[in-house]
Swiss-Prot record:
Belongs to the eukaryotic initiation factor 4E family. Expressed at the posterior end of developing oocytes (at protein level). Preferential expression in the pole cells, at different developmental stages. The gene is eIF4E1. Changing I123A: Abolishes interaction with cup and mxt. It comes from Drosophila melanogaster. This is Eukaryotic translation initiation factor 4E1. One of its GO terms (cellular component) is cytosol.
């Protein structure tokens, strides 16, 4: 059976972010690294005890029937690993006839480890989406825009990447996502989301934080990112305030921290 995320590609707009076929069920989906995407307080579902081990006669063993409707949905959720936050995936495809806000497409939200991997395995990696496109992953109800109330006083850590390796680009983006949904930072409450920009000369990954004046939080997040992403000496992390980015572009934007 195809997942809900795969069926969604038939009506999502735009369609170019989805793979053309569902992954083989024989291959399975990759397991999230425990260091980055450990679920928050996963519920413990214990197996039923063997009546012979408990000493109870087999005839007294209660029989159960599969739940239906809403009960089935709730039961299924017990076997998933919940995340601490609900996250929303956005996709932007460049269209000069539309405003920036209208180009942003809210795709879907998820709140478990399993639903994250189901979504991730059915969309194209960043290296395969169109030039001028963006993926954004933000906490639910935060739009990937400077003007959003949750973002306008904040800033972002920016990693600029050359075009040499598609694999490195895809792996780096996945590691960023796992850091976000796995709450890998001491100041995870300051995290708003992350964006990857696919452009002609270079690509950018940015991690957005809520308060650009919170130096302690910004630096802790920056150092954790550098360690988690295993960035080399040629890849610097630069922290920029959104208010500066809104009035200047490219290399003209002042960086208040560099790691």
């Amino acid at each position: 059976m195809q997942s809900d995320f795969h069926r969604m590609k038939n009506f999502a707009n735009p369609k170019s972010m989805f793979k053309t076929s569902a992954p083989s069920t024989e291959q399975g989906r990759p397991e999230p690294p425990t260091s980055a995407a450990a679920p928050a307080e996963a519920k413990d579902v214990k197996p039923k005890e063997d009546p012979q081990e408990t000493g109870e006669p087999a005839g007294n063993t209660a029989t159960t029937t599969a739940p239906a409707g809403d009960d089935a949905v709730r039961t299924e959720h017990l076997y998933k690993h919940p995340l601490m936050n609900v996250w929303t995936l956005w996709y932007l495809e460049n269209d000069r006839s539309k405003s920036w806000e209208d180009m942003q497409n809210e795709i879907t939200s998820f709140d478990t480890v399993e639903d994250f991997w189901s979504l991730y395995n059915h969309i194209k990696p960043p290296s395969e989406i169109k030039l001028g496109s963006d993926y954004s992953l933000f906490k639910k109800n935060i739009r990937p825009m400077w003007e959003d109330a949750a973002n306008k006083q904040g800033g972002r850590w920016v990693i600029t990447l050359n075009k040499s390796s598609k694999t490195d680009l895809d792996n780096l983006w996945l590691d960023v996502l796992l850091c976000l949904i796995g709450e890998a930072f001491d100041h995870s409450d300051q995290i708003c989301g992350a964006v990857i920009n696919i452009r002609g000369k270079s690509n950018k990954i940015s991690i957005w934080t809520a308060d650009g004046n919170n130096e302690e939080a910004a630096l802790e997040i920056g150092h954790k990112l550098r360690d988690a992403l295993r960035l080399g000496r040629n890849n610097s992390l630069q922290y920029q305030l959104h208010k500066d980015t809104m009035v200047k572009q490219g290399s003209n934007v002042k960086s208040i921290y560099t790691l």
